[in-house]
Amino acid sequence: MFPALSSERVLVLIPARMAATRLPGKPLADVGGRPMIVEVARRAAAAAIGPVAVATDSEEIAAAVRAAGVTAVLTRADHPSGSDRIFEALGALDPDGAVDVVVNVQGDLPTIAPQTIRSALAPLAEPAVDIATLCAEIVVEDERTDPNVVKVVGSPLDDNLLRALYFTRATAPFGAGPLYHHIGLYAYRRPALARFVALAPSMLEQREKLEQLRALEAGMRIDVAVVDAVPLGVDTQAHLDRARAILALEAAEQK
């Protein structure tokens, strides 16, 4: 039931809600002839690491997802984060605990490559890792000082893997060397996800507005796979227009 790249059983969950203020109705915005949330689910399925489901508090999103043949789970509307939403969905889909790893893919990444999603599992080859995530080296100078670009401060384990020491909106670490742009896609060991959502928000999490700091402050280990590029996150109309252009180009190249 749970095919994966390893012996562990993996479930991919995509949290989605209709509450976006900068781009109302974002999950159902048309990209390449599909609702955005459906396009993300299609790419997650192409990663071929396990079943894919959408966790949402919206009947409208659930209906659109199901019409495309994708599993949808209706969740409570009052979750403070996507992590809480996917934890509820995990319990509904897998009450017997068969799933070992939960991959949380953001629903606003309609151009993400399936290989990028697969890369999130790589750090979990180390049994001591609780949570895996992704980053890419910053190559645009302005992003080094942009507080909207979250940086990973990490200790290199090899050329494509870091152990996360901190996440920050500041320009860090200081000095010569690469900076890394964090990509908000996570692979949780199931016990780590359960522990994470049970923790109270931490001081640094509230200060930086970055929930992954809650895990680090609690002593959980986060390792980070380095990928080639940051996938486009859609938050504005300009982002949506760019995503549509990218998908149109992909479609033209496949003809």
UniProtKB/Swiss-Prot annotation:
GO BP terms in the entry: CMP-keto-3-deoxy-D-manno-octulosonic acid biosynthetic process; lipopolysaccharide biosynthetic process
Q: What is its main location?
A: cytoplasm
Against CDD domains, the record matches this protein to: CMP-KDO-Synthetase
Q: Which InterPro entries match?
A: Cytidylyl_trans, KdsB, Nucleotide-diphossugar_trans
* Pathways involved: Nucleotide-sugar biosynthesis; CMP-3-deoxy-D-manno-octulosonate biosynthesis; CMP-3-deoxy-D-manno-octulosonate from 3-deoxy-D-manno-octulosonate and CTP: step 1/1; Bacterial outer membrane biogenesis; lipopolysaccharide biosynthesis
Alphabetic keyword roster: Cytoplasm, Lipopolysaccharide biosynthesis, Nucleotidyltransferase, Transferase
Reactions mediated catalytically: 3-deoxy-alpha-D-manno-oct-2-ulosonate + CTP = CMP-3-deoxy-beta-D-manno-octulosonate + diphosphate
Enzyme's top EC category = transferase
Task: From the Swiss-Prot or TrEMBL record, state where the protein is found.
Answer: Cytoplasm
The protein's superkingdom reads Bacteria
Under which EC number(s) is this enzyme classified? 2.7.7.38
Task: Sum up the protein's function in the record's words.
Answer: Activates KDO (a required 8-carbon sugar) for incorporation into bacterial lipopolysaccharide in Gram-negative bacteria.
Q: Which PANTHER family match?
A: 3-DEOXY-MANNO-OCTULOSONATE CYTIDYLYLTRANSFERASE (PTHR42866), 3-DEOXY-MANNO-OCTULOSONATE CYTIDYLYLTRANSFERASE, MITOCHONDRIAL (PTHR42866:SF2)
Family affiliation:
Belongs to the KdsB family.
- The protein's name in its UniProt record: 3-deoxy-manno-octulosonate cytidylyltransferase
Q: Which organism is it from?
A: Xanthobacter autotrophicus (strain ATCC BAA-1158 / Py2)
Q: What is the lineage of its organism?
A: Bacteria, Pseudomonadati, Pseudomonadota, Alphaproteobacteria, Hyphomicrobiales
Query: Which gene specifies this protein's sequence?
Result: kdsB
